[in-house]
UniProtKB/Swiss-Prot annotation:
GO terms for molecular function: proton-transporting ATP synthase activity, rotational mechanism. Keywords: ATP synthesis, Cell inner membrane, Cell membrane, CF(0), Hydrogen ion transport, Ion transport, Membrane, Transmembrane, Transmembrane helix, Transport. The gene is atpB. It is found in: Cell inner membrane. The chain crosses the membrane at residues 18-38, 44-64, 79-99, 105-125, 137-157, 177-197, 202-222. This is ATP synthase subunit a. GO terms for biological process: proton motive force-driven plasma membrane ATP synthesis. The keyword Hydrolase does not apply. It comes from the Bacteria. The keyword Secreted does not apply. It comes from Helicobacter hepaticus (strain ATCC 51449 / 3B1). CDD domains: ATP-synt_Fo_a_6 (cd00310). Pfam families: ATP-synt_A (PF00119).
Amino acid sequence: MDERLFTFAGLINPNHDFIIGFHTLLVAVILLILARYATHKMQVVPSGIQNVFEFIISGIISFAKDIVGEQVARKYFPLAATIAFLVFFGNAIGIIPGFEAPTSSWSFTLVLALVVFFYYHFEGIRAQGVLKYFKHFMGPVWWLAPLMFPVEIISHFSRIISLSFRLFGNIKGDDMFLLVMLMLAPWIVPVAPFAILTFMALLQAFVFMILTYVYIHGAVVVDEEH
């Protein structure tokens, strides 16, 4: 018998796809409400939730520009930050008893990985042109092309698996960890495990965001040696 955590959505429909879809929609609504609230009455001197969001935004851009440069960090911030917030809240909602993290479903993480995969290729082709972009797949010298091209293709497709399974595996493991802790101490609020899971939720969102930036940077920045 499949042992599953209780969820409020499961009371409506026990189907797993419905539960994941319900929590995905819930996370999206929460993000929209927060974004609306933060930008409803914007002030020159920020305060409250506007101050929190501006601190987070400036922190993300500041960190990303050290890795991919300021131009890429700012230009692709909307996509990278949206994914980061979606992943974080998608992870964090599963920590609350009665809710399930949509990121614990491989279908959810696969969609995010595919969005990043197709987007960075699209941006790479738009920035460099089709021929020049795929020329980078051929290697530094023409006679290495038969070897380098399939290696590059496999490398790029492996990013889909890497992005989706890393997030899925970690959050699925967190769910099992939470299940075990609640079985061992159902009447005691496990503060330490919840703190660990919150940190892991933040870490996974950060990793996904940085990899998104790195993949886009690798696609759009022209290598002068080629």
